């Protein structure tokens, strides 16, 4: 699982829309969409807030393996 897929899965687990996640991170819905489609990656300044939001360590977020449901 790549980072974009992981962000998508985590967002869905939290029942957040792309717009809601974008609002929480102060980025646009389009930015979230690009992250999820691996067209771009989050800046380092957004990695920590993403981890905080999903209650993960940076290592857990950046690992490329299946998320347990």
Predicted regions: what they are:
Residues 45-60:
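DNA major-groove recognition helix of helix-turn-helix/homeodomain DNA-binding modules
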Residues 62-69:
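Short, charged recognition helix plus adjacent turn
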Residues 7, 21-22, 32-35, 61:
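Conserved hydrophobic/aromatic packing and binding residues within compact polymer-binding modules
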Residues 5-24:
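Short basic helix-loop element that most often maps to the first helix and adjoining turn
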Residues 8, 44-45:
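Short, Lys/Arg-enriched C-terminal cap helix and immediately downstream tail that follows
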Residues 27-40, 66:
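Recognition helix of helix-turn-helix/homeodomain-like DNA-binding domains
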